[in-house]
Amino acid sequence: GKDTEGQTGTLAKKYNARKVMIVYGGGSIIRSGLLQRIEESLQQAGVEYVKLGGIQPNPTDPKVYEGIELARKEGVDFMLPVGGGSVIDTAKAIAAGVPYEGDFWDFYIGKAKVKKALKVGVVLTIPAAGSEGSGNTVITKLEGLQKLSLRVPELLRPVFAVMNPELTYTLPPYQTACGIADMMVHIMER
C-alpha cells in the first residue's frame, strides 16, 4: 500500500537482517527519492547496507559474480532488490551463490543443488514477471549465451514484497503495457 517502502527496515529486521545488499537497476530509484527513503528506513531500524546498482534487463552473470564477491566481502546476510524481475532475479542468484563455495552457475546447469541461501525481501517498482512471489530466477551466462532458469521456492521465494502502487505511477505507458504482456505470458506458461 501507500508509503509501505518506509517499512522496509522493520521488515528486514524482522527476518534478522544485520547487513542488507540493495540491488537496483538504473537511476530512476535515485531520481524519485525511493532509494533515499529505503536507506532511511534501514537506518532507523539499525540495519546496515551496501548497494549494487546497474542491473540491466535480462540479467547476466557478471553482475551476479560481482554481487557475490561484494556480499562476501561486506558480510551481507540479506538481499533487498528494488525494481522489477531482472533486479529480483539477480538478487536471488546472489542469495544462492553467497553461501556456496563453487560457481553459482552450477545451480543453473544442474551440477549442484541450492541447499542454503540468503533471505530475499523485495521492493517492487514494476509489475510484470511475478518474481516478487516466486522462487524462480532466470540469468544469462554471457559465455555461450545460455539463458537458464532455476527454481527453488523453499529458499529463493522472497520473505516479503513491498508493493506500493504509487511507485508504478511514473512508468511510461509502454513499460506498463510490457509488464501486462509479461504477466499474461507467465500465466499462460503455467
Where are these regions (language model features)?
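A glycine/threonine-rich phosphate-anchoring loop and its flanking beta-alpha core
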Residues: P99-R190
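Conserved active-site and cofactor/substrate-binding residues in soluble primary-metabolism enzymes
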Residues: D3, Q7, Y15, G33, ...
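An N-terminal, well-structured beta->alpha segment
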Residues: G1-L52
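Gly/Ser/Thr-rich beta-alpha loop segments that engage phosphate groups in nucleotides
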Residues: D3, G27, G85-V87, G130-E132
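N-terminal small/polar loop signature for handling phosphorylated ligands or for N-terminal nucleophile
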Residues: I30-G102
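Local beta-strand N-terminus motif with an aromatic residue
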Residues: A17-V20, V76, P158
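Conserved beta-strand elements of the Class I
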Residues: M21-I22, F78-L80, G121
